[in-house]
From Swiss-Prot:
Its EC number is 4.3.1.7. This is Ethanolamine ammonia-lyase small subunit. The gene is eutC. Gene3D superfamilies: Ethanolamine ammonia-lyase light chain (EutC), Ethanolamine ammonia-lyase light chain (EutC), N-terminal domain. Adenosylcob(III)alamin binds at residues 209, 230. Belongs to the EutC family. It comes from Lachnoclostridium phytofermentans (strain ATCC 700394 / DSM 18823 / ISDg) (Clostridium phytofermentans). It is found in: Bacterial microcompartment. The lineage of its organism: Bacteria, Bacillati, Bacillota, Clostridia, Lachnospirales. The keyword Lyase applies. The basic unit is a heterodimer which dimerizes to form tetramers. The heterotetramers trimerize; 6 large subunits form a core ring with 6 small subunits projecting outwards.
Length: 296
């Protein structure tokens, strides 16, 4: 069957479908291949949708009281007032969700750069995890070190130090790179007021919070303060926490850890968290306790 015969057959089928009320011209089915207009290519960069402040981003078309709605939104990063198109999210809302989700995935699967570690003069050690996949599927290996790594830890930290500050990548490398450089100086400055010095700082790759117990067991440190990237969400991929424990060792209950959480630019600022951590460390040294025992 040639092209002309095929075209006539299609026309007949169309006429039958519309009841014969439409006169379909053969010229209307002429192929338009090769007649498309040229595509316009712009060299301009698209704006980064993640830079929009979600607290002031208002997409409702007909709000009864926009001012009060914005006042409520200013108190929370929750996705309020995002509007809808029929039963669906608006395009901008969906793009923002996908962008925030992508940022969260990047934070989990990317590594803290070697340049960042060298710049801050951290001493690099690694847990028993071989790679990121094993780290995510075997949390137990993220709490232990090999013999060679333990020797590096002992050599760096010494025996029975009063305070150790350690950094672990955890589940968000972005959180470490965004907050550590501001928080550590704040902790050191606060501790210096109490005449407390700290040894060189360890950086732990593939770290779980329990890695501080292995370090405490090896060094017999009085207080260990661990800065670790927390599991990212759609609000932020840069949230870090500080886990502080007195006499951390194998088998220590989670209730003995004191936690400063939600450390990021939209929560507790790194400088503020650092000052608070220094005060907590001094209090732990004085009371020889941490976690819920510190409140007793």
């Amino acid at each position: 069957m040639d092209e002309q015969s095929l075209r006539k057959m299609v026309e007949q089928m169309v006429e039958q479908m519309v009841g014969g009320g439409t006169n379909v011209k053969s010229t209307t089915s002429t192929s338009s291949v090769g007649q498309g207009s040229a595509t316009a290519i712009s060299s301009e960069c698209l704006p980064d949708i993640t830079k929009i402040d979600i607290k002031s981003w208002f997409l409702l078309d007909h709000a009864k009281n926009k001012e009060e709605y914005l006042h409520m939104k200013s108190k929370t990063p929750a996705r309020l007032g995002v509007g809808r198109a029929g039963a669906r999210y608006k395009t901008m809302t969906m793009l923002r969700v996908r962008a925030d989700h992508a940022a969260a995935q990047d934070a989990v699967f990317s590594d803290v750069s070697e340049e960042f570690i060298k710049k801050n003069k951290f001493v690099f050690v690694k847990t028993l995890c071989k790679d990121k996949d094993e780290y995510l599927t075997r949390p137990d290996l993220g709490r232990r070190f090999g013999k060679e790594e333990l020797e590096v830890i002992k050599k760096t930290c010494g025996q029975s130090p009063k305070v150790l500050i350690i950094v672990g990548d955890g589940l968000s490398s972005s959180a470490i790179e965004a907050n550590v450089e501001d928080m550590i100086p704040a902790i050191k400055q606060g501790l210096s007021m109490f005449q407390i010095n700290v040894p060189p700082i360890l950086f732990i790759k593939y770290a779980r919070v329990g890695a501080m117990d292995d370090i405490g067991q090896a060094t017999d440190a009085d207080v260990i303060c661990m800065l670790v990237g927390e599991r990212p969400g759609l609000v932020t991929a840069e949230s870090m926490s500080a886990y502080i424990c007195y006499k951390a060792k194998h088998g220590v209950p989670e209730s003995k850890r004191t936690v400063i959480s939600n450390i990021h630019r939209g929560g507790t600022t790194p400088v503020e968290a650092g000052a608070h951590a220094a005060e907590l460390i001094k209090k732990m040294l004085d009371k020889k306790a941490s976690g819920i025992e510190l409140k007793g």
